[in-house]
Amino acid sequence: MLNELILTAVAYIVGSIPTGLLLARASGVDIRATGSGNIGATNVYRTLGRTVGIATLLGDCLKGLVPVLVARKLGFADPWVAAVGLAAFLGHVYTIFLGFKGGKGVATALGVFLGVSPLSVLGALALFIGIVATTRYISLGSIIAAAAMPLFVAAVERRPLLVGMTLVIAVIVIVKHRENIRRLREGTENRFKA
């Protein structure tokens, strides 16, 4: 049990690394003071361009994926795999390095989900791409894909603890998008420009 506790704590710390903030700072920008003020990949992309935005997306995704893969490699049971994945995600959303104020968690959740159920991610990703291609709203695609993810995991994995973890993550992602939801309702949400 000691190994499981250690990896869960490490996953939270790894998840807490503010990838977007660090990459933006390396470019001479405080990402919290530009655009939406969010440290996630979408704001970094809009502010600093494709290269830094994609690097942020990949870094945030890896923060969720790597701890889950390590937990699986070490043979952790589902409760601990779920704990490690949730810890990495919570680290990103409530980072210790920024006073427990982090990103919205979409990319880190993607990494966790890739480690838990890659086939489920394909369904959610197809949904995300379809919505963004149709509406040009990344936030709407993220919200709907997050809401659908527990259903995909339930259908593919049929493992209650992993479904439960996915549901908790999905709810937090949606709650973190409450301002986006308000702007979508008001018609003031920014559309994605390739």
Curated annotation (Swiss-Prot):
GO terms for biological process: phospholipid biosynthetic process. The chain crosses the membrane at residues 4-24, 80-100, 112-132, 137-157, 161-181. Its EC number is 2.3.1.275. Keywords: Cell inner membrane, Cell membrane, Lipid biosynthesis, Lipid metabolism, Membrane, Phospholipid biosynthesis, Phospholipid metabolism, Transferase, Transmembrane, Transmembrane helix. Pathway: Lipid metabolism; phospholipid metabolism. It comes from the Bacteria. Belongs to the PlsY family. PANTHER family: GLYCEROL-3-PHOSPHATE ACYLTRANSFERASE-RELATED (PTHR30309:SF0), INNER MEMBRANE PROTEIN YGIH (PTHR30309). This is Glycerol-3-phosphate acyltransferase. It comes from Geobacter sulfurreducens (strain ATCC 51573 / DSM 12127 / PCA). The lineage of its organism: Bacteria, Pseudomonadati, Thermodesulfobacteriota, Desulfuromonadia, Geobacterales.
